[in-house]
């Protein structure tokens, strides 16, 4: 049977290499290094909160407010607001694509009675009747859709800030209208958006659409007293394309210095590349249901040039504040459904942990100042096909969010071998076009980025930016600051084990029961158990050895030798003619039941306590006394074998821990029975006990004396189909005595027949056992 794997683990002898022992001890210990150079050693942060000082400007980072620029004519890029500062009455700007869009904005000063004024627009002299009875400036948006038509006033903006804005985005032209400080946006459609050019007659600024909230603030409230713009005086727009060469954005500055320590400021331009990770889990059954589509942390390593220096960088991307959605197409097994799929929206955050191999990250322990500035990036989702067995496949596609820099902190990210002191960049989100939908379902036009295909076929997303930090380092550059609590490879192994446990637990839904029963009948030895792993034969042998070394420290292995000796003692000292106290004393050598029982009665409490304790060790007795039936360990080993074959994360380092955990944790709620003539006595690990007749399944009183007599000699049988299931099966379907006896003995052929007949009661019981195989 499949439980041969556990017996083999318990009985096989093996040699222990001293090198392996040293390696194992080294991987399990965490070394603590304590230093006390100054008050800085008392915390990871400095004792005071100083400012970060100067953060040098850099053309790497796109400014929020770029300008001011001199009046000019050009074709503005899409997705950028043009913020125009009108300083006189008259024409502010003219914009056209010479096909279906002509618009001009004229400024009217306050307190103007109705009057006809001449304006030169697109080389033509036009007369408009204008007026303004308010204390604010009025901006009239004059529009026509053809060169043959006359202009008319399409929108009006009443403003005391004297700013107007225009944006090309999404096939439309957007402008502001209404009255400040509550002016809002509106749009006009056009069939030729890309060819729209603009002639501006005043100073203007350029703002990315990702910073539209700032543009709205400037329109309604004006610019702040001191604005961080690229220029001090208006420059020609051509200066925007000049490649600034400033060495100071990547520099090392000594802030202060003593004999042993110095404060260093590092300024760096960085390129952050990251990708989203996801997990898609399909339910068992007919293949129409999905249980989970979720985000997972994802690592990415890459190289890039910074001031001629080749930099190796490592990022880890994770999300926080996900929104759980679901779709239920109906109650039938063939109705498409998703129990849960995650979507990131405005209330979510994206974290990107960044590390590179430059000096800036070498001694990142005592940091007293940290600041950063990053560009925004748009992430657009792709398509994912739900491959159902019959019918047109539902397809989840679309969805988009824009990431905006929201802060930076220190962090630690884990690779397969080391841990890295990193910078965690936090991004807030805004939803963007297009929305996402699930084709062929009722789910349409929802906003956010679902986890089904967040990378949309892209290898990575990229953000440019810069950071500046100051920290305390040794004066001698050859020294490295000791980390107060060093992180060893063991923590990386724990992270791998955590991921593997999650994967193992999710695979329970994908195990077919008929295949499981067939697999449980095979004698799974060490080699066949691990042969499904993608590895060579030599590696398989090595993995088997590693598993045995780990398994010898398990609870099952440490108790088997004690149990073997105690069983023989119990059998020799058992007497059929003494009191129940004597019988329980005989078995107490391996059950520890009667140690604290001075006067055993037939009360339910005493029986329950005793049977609960005994049942915990029935597994050991069953393992050394083979029966012709199937055991819980057969199912455990079969599930373990199936999951090992299906796993994508199993490895030499993680397999020993997983096998050991499975031996101890798979199927925690077990029931065992002892059979005598036509009566069955059944107990479980929860302390419940039953006694019943095979023919009728009628319960009879549980005779603790009889149970005590049988427990040392009779074979212990796994109650795979427990009493409640048998009772339910007999009441609803009716079963013969032969069928009942075979089910009581956990006969594998009988189990397979019921499963092949799709008997819902038996299938449900086996499914419950599979779902108990979790770590």
UniProtKB/Swiss-Prot annotation:
Residues 307-309 are annotated as: DGE motif. GO terms for biological process: permeabilization of host organelle membrane involved in viral entry into host cell; virion attachment to host cell. The record marks 230-231, 240-241, 246-247 as: Cleavage. Residues 247-479 are annotated as: Antigen domain. Disulfide bonds join 317-379. It holds the Pfam family VP4_helical. A motif (YGL motif) lies at residues 447-449. Residues 483-517 form a coiled coil. Residues 509-775 are annotated as: Spike foot. Residues 247-478 are annotated as: Spike body and stalk (antigen domain). Residues 388-408 are annotated as: Hydrophobic. Transmembrane segments: none annotated. Residues 65-223 are annotated as: Spike head. The keyword Disulfide bond applies. A motif (KID motif) lies at residues 643-645. This strain probably does not use sialic acid to attach to the host cell. In group A rotaviruses, VP4 defines the P serotype. VP8* Forms the head of the spikes and mediates the recognition of specific host cell surface glycans. It is the viral hemagglutinin and an important target of neutralizing antibodies. In sialic acid-dependent strains, VP8* binds to host cell sialic acid, most probably a ganglioside, providing the initial contact. In some other strains, VP8* mediates the attachment to histo-blood group antigens (HBGAs) for viral entry. Belongs to the rotavirus VP4 family. This is Outer capsid protein VP4.
């Amino acid at each position: 049977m499949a439980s041969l794997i556990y017996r083999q683990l318990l009985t096989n002898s093996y040699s222990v290499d001293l090198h392996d022992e040293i390696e194992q001890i080294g991987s399990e210990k965490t070394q603590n290094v304590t230093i006390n150079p100054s008050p800085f050693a008392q915390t990871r942060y400095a004792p005071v909160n100083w400012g970060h000082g100067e953060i040098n400007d850099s053309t790497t980072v796109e400014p929020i407010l770029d300008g001011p620029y001199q009046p000019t004519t050009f074709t503005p890029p899409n997705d950028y607001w043009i913020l125009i500062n009108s300083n006189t009455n008259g024409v502010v700007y003219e914009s056209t694509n010479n096909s279906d869009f002509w618009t001009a904005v004229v400024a009217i000063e306050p307190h103007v009675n109705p009057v006809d004024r001449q304006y030169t627009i697109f080389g033509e002299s036009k007369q408009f009747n204008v007026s303004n009875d308010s204390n604010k400036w009025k901006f009239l948006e004059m529009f026509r859709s053809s060169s043959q038509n006359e202009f008319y006033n399409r929108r009006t903006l009443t403003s005391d800030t004297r700013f107007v804005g225009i944006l090309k985005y999404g096939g439309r032209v957007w402008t502001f209208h209404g009255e400040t400080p509550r002016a809002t946006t509106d749009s006009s459609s056009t069939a030729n958006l890309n060819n729209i050019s603009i002639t501006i007659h005043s100073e203007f600024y350029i703002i990315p659409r990702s910073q539209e909230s700032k543009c709205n603030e400037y329109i309604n409230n004006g610019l702040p007293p001191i604005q961080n713009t690229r220029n001090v005086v208006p420059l020609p727009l051509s200066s925007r394309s000049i490649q600034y060469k400033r060495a100071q954005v990547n520099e090392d500055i000594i802030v202060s210095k003593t004999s042993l320590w110095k404060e260093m400021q590092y300024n760096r331009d960085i390129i952050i590349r990251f990708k989203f990770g996801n997990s898609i889990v399909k339910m068992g059954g007919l293949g129409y249901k999905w249980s989970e589509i979720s985000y997972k942390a994802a690592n990415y390593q890459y190289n890039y040039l910074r001031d001629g220096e080749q930099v190796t960088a490592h990022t880890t991307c994770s999300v926080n504040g996900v929104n759980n959605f679901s779709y239920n197409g109906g109650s039938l097994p063939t109705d498409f459904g998703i129990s849960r799929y995650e979507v990131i929206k405005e209330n979510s955050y994206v974290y990107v942990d960044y590390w590179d191999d430059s000096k800036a990250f070498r001694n990142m322990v005592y940091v007293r100042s940290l600041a950063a500035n990053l560009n925004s990036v748009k992430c657009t989702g792709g398509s994912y096909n739900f491959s159902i067995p019959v019918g047109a496949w539902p397809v989840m596609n679309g969805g988009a969010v824009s990431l905006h820099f929201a802060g930076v902190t220190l962090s630690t990210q884990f690779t397969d071998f080391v841990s890295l002191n990193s910078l965690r960049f936090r991004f807030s989100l805004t939803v963007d076009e297009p929305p996402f939908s699930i084709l062929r379902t009722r789910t349409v036009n929802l906003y956010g980025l679902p986890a089904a295909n967040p990378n949309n076929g892209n290898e990575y997303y990229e953000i440019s930016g810069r950071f500046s930090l100051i920290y305390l380092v040794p004066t001698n550059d050859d020294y490295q600051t000791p980390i107060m609590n060093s992180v060893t490879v063991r923590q990386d192994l724990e992270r791998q084990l955590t991921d593997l446990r999650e994967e193992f637990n999710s695979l329970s839904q994908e195990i077919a029961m008929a295949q499981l029963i067939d697999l449980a009948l095979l004698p799974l030895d060490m080699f066949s158990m691990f042969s499904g792993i993608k590895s060579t034969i030599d590696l398989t042998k090595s993995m088997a050895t590693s598993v045995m070394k780990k398994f010898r420290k398990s609870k099952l292995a440490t108790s088997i030798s004690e149990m073997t000796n105690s069983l023989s003692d119990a059998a020799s000292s058992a007497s059929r003619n003494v009191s129940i106290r004597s019988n329980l004393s005989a078995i107490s050598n391996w059950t520890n039941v009667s140690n604290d029982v001075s006067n055993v009665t037939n009360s339910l409490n005493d029986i329950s306590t005793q049977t609960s304790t005994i049942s915990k060790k029935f597994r050991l007795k069953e393992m050394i006394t083979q029966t012709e039936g199937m055991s819980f360990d057969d199912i455990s080993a079969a599930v373990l074998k199936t999951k090992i074959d299906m796993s994508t994360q199993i490895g030499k380092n993680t397999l020993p821990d997983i096998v050991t955990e499975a031996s101890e944790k798979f199927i925690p709620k077990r029931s065992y029975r002892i059979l005598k003539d036509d009566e069955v006595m059944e107990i479980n690990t929860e302390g419940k006990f039953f006694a019943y007749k095979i023919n009728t399944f009628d319960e009879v009183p549980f005779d603790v004396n009889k149970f005590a007599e049988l427990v040392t000699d009779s074979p212990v049988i796994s109650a795979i189909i427990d009493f409640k299931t048998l009772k339910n099966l007999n009441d609803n379907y009716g079963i013969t005595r032969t069928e009942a006896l075979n089910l009581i003995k956990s006969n594998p052929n009988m189990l397979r027949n019921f499963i092949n007949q799709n008997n819902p009661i038996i299938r449900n019981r086996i499914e419950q056992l599979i779902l108990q195989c979790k770590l």
